[in-house]
Design a protein with these regions (language model features):
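Blade/loop signatures of beta-propeller domains
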Residues: 102-151, 305, 309-310
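N-terminal secretory signal peptides that target proteins for export/translocation
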Residues: 1-4
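Extracytoplasmic electron-transfer domains, predominantly the class I c-type cytochrome c fold
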Residues: 37, 47-93, 342
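Bacterial N-terminal signal peptides
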Residues: 7-19
Length: 605
């Protein structure tokens, strides 16, 4: 008997192992069943190909199937099934989490007062969102720009899109990652001081401000699960977190803005993508602005930009319940007008018909109460979701998807008057009068416009001119840079897009190789910096638009932290200029754009 027991045990183990093996989900089969229709040729609009998805790690794909963009498709899959699909798509097994000890600094100098020296915080280098860095903070002249050289590079593991824009202050660079890691790097060398792990990817720029308890400074940011965070700027220690919207499609893409002890947060969504699944009950998300106590994270007020609560609104052609009104996501950071006691937000398209009156609008919302003071809808009737086939969720008369993705800019012109400058994916730009309920002062067309821009993520303004980069990512002639006179909207100059670097000598070009300028641009006195879809970081003369410096990111980089890294398209976030250095995030895996995973820093020898 003593001889038979091990044999029986071995048989049981083998049987159990065989049974488990038989039950292991087939990731390839699940992909073919659930995903191939959209992610293999001919595919659908905006869905990345399987090859493009291969740059993501399995964890990121599991997250997308659980509570991200593909949550509807993954809703009835088991955990092992989601993992099997993710491993198949990624082409690799689940790996370790990001190693934040790589490239660690040997010493940690005190942060001190990070706002006492040159800095860039938040999205637009200030609450007015001008994306103009004055000379005392830039410490870089037009004459010096041609001498910029690469000083350091940092690679981001398991990353295909460098969503976030850096914040630089007190000799530190703060940035969030696609995997939720928020890091503090040394701005001069690129070594890492500390890291903090958010619960989801961080797409926003980070805002920095003094703590109310006089214990240093705090960093504020949001993630793609609609959580807002406050952490200590010197240590990365968590101060508080707050979920500001419970809708499953909600996310935060615009940088929070700190003003007078309050943190103002805008909320966007991916529901227009979720609704591409015919089984999704469309649609119930509404864009909103939330005011939080910066010290505690407690909610002070919340304002949905569509006042009416979504409810049953008829049935689809298939007899399913339809809901509405919905949409008007706010993709960008709010703009503070302290003198008038309001903040300005730019809203996106509606998801349902009839399109809400506040979709595709510029809105003024009172800082103290959240009351809507006025709005100006610049594109009415724009009801849009991502449609495929005979999806009953699709609006009968779909709009052009011409949301506002860029923050409004509040500028005081050289004549002392204020102007609110806005740019839209339609390709139209406007000067609005903040004193007359946002009345239109001038219009200028910067590009033909499309669902991917037009003006996609951001423009720059000084006291005489506004500078607009044209995306045109899915138009025949993408790219181009315009300068217009602030007082009149008249064109001062137009710079033709240069030939794409990714299609240069010895290069094949191919998918995602074009001159689109979807990324936000940045101005300093005499210079405009632009990052292109072709992988080129360029500096232009603010007087003529002529290119005075170019850096080609289409290559692999030796990194401070040893993580393999390569350049690619620049999209969404823009260059940041502080204390004689230029910082840029490179890589953006989306429709018509190419992946990358590197943060680059340039300076003078």
């Amino acid at each position: 008997m003593t001889c038979r027991t091990p044999s029986l045990a071995l048989v049981l183990v083998l049987v159990a192992t065989a049974t488990l093996g038989a039950q292991t989900p087939d990731g390839a089969a699940l992909f073919e069943e659930r995903c191939a229709q959209c992610h293999t040729p001919p595919g659908v609009d905006r869905a990345p190909t399987l090859e493009a998805l291969r740059g993501r790690g399995p964890d990121a794909i599991v997250n997308a199937l659980t509570d991200g963009l593909m949550q509807v498709e993954g809703a009835d899959l088991t955990g092992p099934e989601r993992l099997a699909v993710a491993v198949f798509i990624a082409g690799t097994d689940r790996g370790d989490t990001t190693d934040t000890t790589l490239g660690a600094c040997e010493s940690a100098p005190a942060l001190g007062d990070p706002l006492a020296a040159p800095y860039w915080t938040g999205w637009g280098a200030g609450p007015r969102n001008l994306r103009f860095q004055p000379a005392e903070h830039a410490r870089l002249t037009a004459g010096q720009v041609p001498d910029l050289t690469l000083r350091w590079a940092v690679g981001f593991a398991d990353t295909t899109s460098m969503w976030a824009q850096p914040t630089v202050a007190g000799g530190h660079l703060f940035i969030g990652g696609q995997d939720g890691t928020v890091s503090a790097f040394d701005a001069a060398t690129g070594c890492r001081h500390w890291a903090y792990g958010a619960s989801a990817g961080v797409r926003t720029a980070i805002s920095l401000g003094a703590r109310s308890d006089d214990r240093g400074h705090a960093l504020f940011f949001g993630d793609v699960d609609a959580n807002v965070y406050a952490i200590d700027a010197a240590t990365g220690d968590e101060l508080w977190t707050r979920e500001v919207e419970t809708h499953p499609g909600a996310r935060i893409t615009g940088a929070p803005v700190l003003h007078d002890g309050r943190l103002y947060v805008t909320v966007s969504s991916l529901e227009e993508a979720l609704a591409s699944n015919p089984g999704y009950p469309c649609c119930t998300f509404r864009g909103s602005v939330v005011a939080l106590d910066a010290a505690t994270g407690d909610e002070i007020w919340k304002r949905y930009v569509i006042p009416e609560t979504p409810g049953p609104d008829g049935t689809t052609a298939d007899g399913d319940q339809r809901f509405g009104p919905a949409g008007a996501a706010i993709w960008s950071a709010p703009t503070v007008d302290a003198g008038r006691g309001v903040l300005y937000v730019a809203t996106g398209n509606a998801y349902t018909q009839p399109a809400a009156e506040t979709s595709d609008s510029i809105m003024a919302i009172e800082l103290t109460t959240g009351a809507i003071r006025w709005w100006n809808q610049l594109t009415p009737g724009d009801a849009f979701i991502i449609c495929r086939g005979n999806n009953p969720n699709c609006p009968e008369d779909a709009g052009p998807d011409h949301d506002f993705g860029a923050s409004p800019a509040l500028v005081t012109m050289s004549n002392g008057r204020d102007l609110l400058v806005v740019g839209q994916k339609s390709g139209m730009t406007y000067g609005l009068n903040p004193e007359s309920d946002g009345g239109v002062v001038w219009r200028y067309r910067a590009g033909p416009g499309s669902a991917l821009g037009g003006i996609e993520w951001g423009f720059a303004v000084d006291d005489e001119k506004a500078y607009f980069a044209n995306s045109g990512l899915i138009t025949p002639e993408p790219g181009g840079l315009s300068a217009v006179r602030l007082r009149t909207g008249e064109l001062v100059w137009y710079a033709e897009p240069p030939p794409p670097l990714c299609a240069g000598e010895g290069r094949s070009g191919g998918f995602g190789c074009n001159a689109a300028l979807a990324a936000a641009i940045t101005a300093i006195p005499g210079v405009i910096f632009s990052g292109s879809n072709d992988g080129g970081l360029r500096a232009h003369s603010a007087d003529t638009g002529a290119v005075i410096w170019t850096f080609d990111t289409n290559r692999e980089f030796e990194t401070v932290n040893g993580v393999p890294a390569s350049g690619g398209s620049m999209n969404a976030s823009g260059p940041v200029v502080v204390d004689g250095m230029v910082y840029v995030s490179v890589g953006y895996q989306f429709i018509g754009s190419r992946p990358g995973n590197v943060l680059l820093a340039f300076g003078l020898n």
